[in-house]
């Protein structure tokens, strides 16, 4: 199957798993999300590029102030129409300029709705973007957390009220004296900023690092690219952590690894959740939330141990989008814990995690 369009950005041919996202806004954040590492990302919103790209400014320890990582993560971008003219008070460059600087190959003029229907019905598949005159690309390597995680332990602190205001855009307590270990499978920088803005000290460790001898108050297990089969050492570490009682929180792949450590089985979703409008119901209540997800697996309901319970259920397909321990502060979710823009009158899952430290 072939789609023909016009190239923009890098002129290099690329290959990778083709995935989609149906969000209306947020392409700078999506393009820097480590979960998309090595993939070809198809955006369904019909016009991309009209508000440019914000500052790539980095804070201490290479923490991005605006984006989700230090660089673009996918190998390719597929869109319907590209807007060369951009306007936004935070914009510093055009999308195409950024793509050329970071060697991201793009194609526009594609019926992204039709492509997304194919991906939705048949599941993710490999694809190629080949600009005219370019050689056929090599077969893609399978993405892994090892490609995007930190290589050593990194400590982040928000030491002053001004630090917190710079991170969060609003004033908050400078510190709560709590230390959170972030297991980096490809952590989004907004998560680290969100933890700092809530007064925590963040210790970021590689995904296969045994941190159990460290002093900490809670553990956050991040999302990331690839398959949980690459993370057996992480599962073994989490098994030791779950023997204790300190708060543990994870989303995406982090949720899946917590579930495996607890003894759950994972199932591949017939239709991957790759959008910002996934409805989830909080069990035991009549409350429904609209969640942002980028996952292709969920926990098998029948495999959940007796000491755990379903926390959130997806209302589209009935998938288990969250579990929690009945007596200990352990939570895993398939969706982002909303640390940037959201319903400010609601307590987010990240707030709930911080409150239990």
Predicted feature locations:
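RNA-binding accessory domains that recognize and position tRNA/RNA substrates
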Residues: 1-208, 228, 340-342, 348, ...
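Phosphate-binding active sites in nucleotide-utilizing proteins
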Residues: 179-243, 247-250, 257
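Cysteine-nucleophile active-site neighborhood
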Residues: 222-292, 298-301, 342-352
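Catalytic beta-strand/loop cores that center a nucleophilic Ser/Cys/Thr
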Residues: 287-328
């Amino acid at each position: 199957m072939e789609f023909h369009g016009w190239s923009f950005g890098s002129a290099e041919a690329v290959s990778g798993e083709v995935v989609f996202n149906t969000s209306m806004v947020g392409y700078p954040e999506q393009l820097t999300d480590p979960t998309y590492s090595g993939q070809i990302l198809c955006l369904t919103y019909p016009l991309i590029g009209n508000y440019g790209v914000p500052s790539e400014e980095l804070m201490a320890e290479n923490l991005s102030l605006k984006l989700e990582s230090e660089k673009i993560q996918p190998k390719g971008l597929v869109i319907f129409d590209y807007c060369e003219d951009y306007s936004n008070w935070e914009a510093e460059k055009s999308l195409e300029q950024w793509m050329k600087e970071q060697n991201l190959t793009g194609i526009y003029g594609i019926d992204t709705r039709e492509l997304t229907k194919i991906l939705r019905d048949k599941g993710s598949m490999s694809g190629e973007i080949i600009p005219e005159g370019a050689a056929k690309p090599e077969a893609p390597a399978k993405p892994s957390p090892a490609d995007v995680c930190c290589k050593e332990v990194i400590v982040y602190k928000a030491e002053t009220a001004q630090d917190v205001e710079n991170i969060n855009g609003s004033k908050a307590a400078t510190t709560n004296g709590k230390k959170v270990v972030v297991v980096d499978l490809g952590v989004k920088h907004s998560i680290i900023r969100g933890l700092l803005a809530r007064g925590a000290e963040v210790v970021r460790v590689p995904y296969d690092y045994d941190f159990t001898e460290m002093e900490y108050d809670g553990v956050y297990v991040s999302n990331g690219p690839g398959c949980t089969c690459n993370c057996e050492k992480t599962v073994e570490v989490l098994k030791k952590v779950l023997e204790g009682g300190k708060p543990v929180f994870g989303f995406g792949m982090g949720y899946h690894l917590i579930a495996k450590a607890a003894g759950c089985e994972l199932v591949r979703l017939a239709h991957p959740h790759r959008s910002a409008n996934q409805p989830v119901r909080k069990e035991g209540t009549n409350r429904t939330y609209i969640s942002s997800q980028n996952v292709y697996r969920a926990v098998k309901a029948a495999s959940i141990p007796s000491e755990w319970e379903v926390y959130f259920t997806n209302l589209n397909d009935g998938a288990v989008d969250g579990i929690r321990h009945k007596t200990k502060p352990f939570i895993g979710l398939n969706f982002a814990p909303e640390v940037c823009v959201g319903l400010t009158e609601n307590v987010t899952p990240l707030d709930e995690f911080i409150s239990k430290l």
